[in-house]
């Protein structure tokens, strides 16, 4: 079976401009409505809206990976880092602090150049113990083994996708990072969608690829 990365120039994504632009128009319209509502709120309400939005995004992103974050810990960590006063603040686990740190770097420093080291830093804070589930994984560096997306019981696994070989990952990521930093002609919403698909197609890390892709 051929996977997307087996084709020549696979990273040169093509799309139906008319259909995409219609959808982007709807997205931009809804963004404008949200911005308008935010501007009508007082400063305290704006702060609460920001806290709620980022907190729920982090909680939902982790749920996709089968992890449950404590919402109170996430909100408290965000409030401390953003300098927002909040009643009933609690201490957060090392893992929650790391997830929040990654998300804030991605959202507040979105205009900073992306680099391998920056991605390695995000990966480090996602796995501070170097363990995912029951297994030790390679942290803060690209994977050195194969990567498959599978489902099914042991012995009856179904392979849904096989990522590029580990030997290809550094070059594939160099190309991806260069594109992220250089292509300023594409709509940012569309660029985020392409970046997500491109990144998960490479699957450069032992674990955490989905969470990092959503941060991107």
Task: Label every model-predicted segment.
Residues 1-216:
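FIC/Doc superfamily catalytic core
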């Amino acid at each position: 079976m051929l996977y997307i990365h087996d084709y020549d120039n696979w990273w040169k994504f093509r799309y139906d401009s008319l259909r995409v632009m219609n959808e982007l128009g709807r997205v931009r319209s809804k963004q404008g409505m949200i911005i308008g509502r935010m501007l009508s709120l007082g400063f305290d309400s704006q702060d609460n809206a920001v806290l709620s939005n980022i907190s729920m995004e982090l909680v939902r992103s982790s749920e996709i990976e089968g992890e449950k974050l404590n919402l109170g810990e996430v909100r408290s960590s965000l409030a401390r880092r953003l300098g927002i006063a909040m009643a009933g603040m609690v201490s957060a686990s090392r893992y929650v602090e790391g997830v929040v740190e990654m998300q804030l770097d991605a959202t507040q420093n979105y205009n900073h150049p992306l680099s391998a080291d920056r991605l390695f830093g995000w990966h480090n804070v996602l796995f501070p113990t170097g363990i995912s589930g029951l297994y030790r994984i390679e942290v803060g560096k690209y994977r050195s083994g194969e990567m498959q997306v599978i489902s099914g019981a042991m012995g009856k696994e179904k392979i849904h996708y096989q990522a590029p070989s580990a030997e290809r990952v550094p070059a594939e990521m160099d190309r991806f990072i260069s594109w992220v930093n250089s292509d300023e002609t594409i709509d940012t919403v569309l660029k985020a969608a392409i970046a997500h698909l491109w990144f998960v197609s490479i699957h450069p890390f032992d674990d955490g690829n989905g969470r990092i892709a959503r941060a991107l």
